[in-house]
Amino acid sequence: KEYIAHNNKKLYSTKVTKLASKLAKNIEIRTFIVKIQQDMIITLEKKFNGIILEGRDCGSVVAPKADLKFYLTANLKVRAERRFNQFVKEKKDITYEQVLGDLRERDVQDKNREHSPLQKPKGAVVVDNSDYNFEETINIVKNIIFSKIPTLKNKI
C-alpha cells in the first residue's frame, strides 16, 4: 500500500490555527488557497486512487463532491480539555482558560465569517466524539466507511 501521511504538529499550534482563521476571512487569499488544495486533491487522487482529507471545511468548500464526508464535533469544554492536555504534553505555557477562550473565539469567527462560514457539509455523517477517545472515534469512522464503501475494507 502506497500512501502519504502528513501529520505535522506545527499545523495544530495555537499560532497557526489563529492565523488560519484570520486568513480564511480574506476572500482573495481564501480563493487562492482553496484552488491550491483542489489541485493537490486531483493530483493525489490520480496517484493514489483516493484521498482522505481533514479540515474544518474540507467537505463543504474544498471537496464538496467527496464520496463520503464526516462532520466531527465535540463539546467545547471537551475539545478545550483535549487541546490543553496536548499542550501540557508539549510543555506549552498556556492555561485551560486560554485554550477554552481561543477555541470559543475561533468557533465564533469561523461560523460567522462572510465567506465560506463553517458549517456541516451537505450529506455529511455527523460524529459527536465528546464521549469517545481517539481510538474509539477512529473505529466509529472506519465502521461507517466500510458500511458505505465495502470495497475499502481490505484496503485500509
Where are these regions (language model features)?
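Phosphate-binding beta-loop-alpha motif at adenosine-nucleotide cofactor sites
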Residues: D67-K69, K120-E135
